[in-house]
Design a protein with these regions (language model features):
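N-lobe entry segment of adenylate-forming
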Residues: 1-74, 78-85, 91, 193
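Conserved AMP-binding/adenylate-forming
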Residues: 89-133, 241-248
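Conserved adenylate-forming
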Residues: 136, 144-149, 156-176, 238-239, ...
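Conserved AMP-binding/adenylation subdomain of ANL enzymes
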Residues: 223-241, 251-292, 306-308
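Flexible, low-complexity linker/hinge segments
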Residues: 178-198, 223-225
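Conserved AMP-binding A3 loop
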Residues: 73-76, 200-224
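ANL superfamily AMP-binding
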Residues: 45, 57-58, 77-104, 112, ...
Length: 324
């Protein structure tokens, strides 16, 4: 146990801390492990803010293909400006203390979803992402369990959600409302820092055998382990480009698609619809974006190999192929 503490103490430098923890691990009576209890940090500072005063602000943070395969790029600076819009919108609509608030979102894995999540992280708002195609009954179960103050979705789903908001005491908002905002640069506020064990986000199990169970992820240990595994298992560095074919409703959509790559300062390639990779022409276009790390569901890899053969993956830029 002592070696475990010493090991992770030596890895603290992998991320930025406002207050570096002195309590590395504490095991309480219920056998729950609490990591870095007295440490303080803000994950948004690790992912975005520490790039803005350097030349890396002009570096491509996200390469993004929409559901219709339209392609966009966002530098760290451009991504930050988009996050500011969502930060401003959340500050305006949340009446209670931001760091005590909870937000649930139902959306596909698109750039607006990413900006909303990063705004939540910056403000200390615990969030929960659910699959865009999850049935109304499944969404309602998660609302009852998570008890959000705000539910975020698109206009199409807003009508079905609104009928529950009075009973379950939340307000419902649409991504389209944020689109209407003009300049929100004045929303830059002093950055707050949070204890390492503060809840960052909650993801629910499928609930296929009963009620879904919420798995809560904190910030310090989550980010540190993510960075450690990306560097040591994936071989990621600042020159990497990673494609994690995941959904924002899965854990891999948070650690290896979003927070990890942005924290390291590399480029993450995000697909709104990963199954589009089964289209040969689209797969070719994606892999030509200088992907160095390809992280896919093992089932998808098998299907793609059966359709295209192994040579389709063997681009000169590709260094690591991983499966989830």
């Amino acid at each position: 146990m002592q070696n475990l503490k010493l090991f992770w103490k030596s890895k603290l430098k992998l991320i930025l801390w406002k207050k570096k923890p002195t309590i590395i691990l504490k095991i309480k009576k219920n056998n729950k492990h609490h990591w870095f209890l007295d440490g303080k940090l803000n994950i948004y500072e690790n992912c975005i803010l520490n790039k803005l005063n350097t030349k890396n602000k002009k570096k491509i943070a996200i390469k993004y293909f929409s559901e219709k395969n339209n392609y966009e790029e966002y530098t760290y600076e451009q991504l930050h400006n988009l996050v500011l819009k969502y930060e401003f919108f959340l500050r305006f609509n949340i009446n209670k203390k931001l760091s005590n608030s909870k937000l649930m979102l139902q959306s596909s894995t698109n750039i607006k979803t990413i900006a909303l999540i990063l705004a939540c992280v910056k403000l200390g708002i615990e969030y929960c992402a659910v699959f865009e195609d999850l049935a109304e009954e499944g969404v309602l179960k998660r609302i009852k369990l998570f008890r959000p103050d705000i539910f975020f979705c698109n206009n199409i789903k807003l009508k079905s959600i609104k009928k529950y908001q009075k009973k379950h005491k939340f307000i419902s908002l649409a991504f389209e409302e944020v689109d209407q905002l003009k300049n929100t640069m004045s929303s830059e506020k002093k950055l707050n820092y949070f204890y390492s064990n503060k809840s960052l986000f909650t993801l629910f199990t499928s609930g296929s055998t009963g009620m879904p169970k919420g798995i809560v992820h904190s910030s310090g240990g989550f980010l540190l382990y993510t960075i450690f595994t990306l560097k040591n298992q994936f071989g990621m560095n600042t020159k990497s480009t990673i494609l994690t074919a995941s959904d924002i409703g899965w854990l891999n959509g948070h650690n290896y698609m979003l927070f990890g790559p942005l924290c390291i300062g590399t480029t993450t390639l995000i697909l709104e619809k990963p199954l589009n990779l089964l289209n040969s022409k689209f797969l070719e276009e994606v892999l030509n974006k200088n992907v160095t790390i390809l992280y896919l569901p093992v089932t998808l890899i098998r299907i793609m190999r059966a359709i295209f053969g192994e040579k389709k993956f063997l681009k000169n830029s590709l260094e690591t192929l991983g499966s989830m």
